[in-house]
Amino acid sequence: MTTNDDDHAAERNTMSMNYELAATLSDEEQRARKGKAKIVCKEEDHVFIKKKEKYEEESEKREFFSHVPRKIRPALRYPQPNFENPNGASSSLNLPFEEDYYMAEYYKKTETINPPNPYHQWSPSSFLTEYTHPRMLEVLHRCGFNRPVVTCYSRTAREMRWWLRQVMKDMRAEDLTLILEKTLSTTDVITTTHGRFSMHFNRLISNDFLKPEERSILEEDTYNDETMGVGAILVDQRSQKWSVILKRWGQNYFLSCGWNDVVKANKLKAGDDICLWAFRCDGVLCFAMRQWRGILCFALVPPLTLRQSSSSNARRLC
């Protein structure tokens, strides 16, 4: 009996010791886990605090620069002297408005020096390009100015500049304008039936080469077979002069009354390329024409001189 009781007591002591050991191990394991978890939380808190400080610093920088207006870079700038602040420390807040004012004044001066011709007629064959920069279009639209138009000449027209410079130098002329680029048709060189050189309005690169009084003369005589038109003198490369008449019929200008002599003397034929230029010489409208094998020039007689002349003299030229 005593042995059995001792065995039971020893077994109970062993079990209690095992329970205590297991509890101790479990408690230590839990404490170890809690301690490691606390360390991880501290590291995460430190990283989060650093990120927060960096974000706050960047936010302060952005808020600081948000109060400073950015400089706008327009396509074109026309600087003007600042009389209010000669040291150059002008306010940047008024910069866009100052740019608009300066650019608007520039185009206003340009239009004042070279006013648009009210008689100008657009033609689909003209080579025209426009400024398309958004900043410039916005400024021009806000200030009420039309977009400037730039005429682009063809390669043939550009190659003739050297010759035109010499012609204008000899004649002391100015205001050179390209009017027409055309290939002569059969009707332009037939001397038996037509006897005229036609210039259709839709083929004109520029239709503002006539003065108002010259244009009114041609408009009054439109669809009139007995019109005198505007007298002209045609000069070829041999300095030989020919009397011609500039007329209008419908939507065409014509050179007649002497054109047949020009065709025969210069041996013009269908297929020859013609470039016609206009310029002013002492206030008189002049033209310069060049074809494949030669150079032709003619100058319009002032309309007042033509009106003073009798109709019989004009018919005699034909």
From Swiss-Prot:
DNA-binding region: 201-293
Transmembrane segments: none
GO cellular component entries: nucleus
PROSITE patterns on file: B3
Pfam family, one: At2g31720-like
Keywords from the UniProt entry: DNA-binding, Nucleus, Transcription, Transcription regulation
InterPro entries per UniProt: At2g31720-like, B3_DNA-bd, DNA-bd_pseudobarrel_sf
Keyword Transcription: yes
Compartments (UniProt record): Nucleus
SMART domains: B3
Main location: nucleus
GO MF terms, alphabetically ordered: DNA binding
CDD domains: B3_DNA
Protein name, as recorded: B3 domain-containing protein At1g05930
Organism name: Arabidopsis thaliana (Mouse-ear cress)
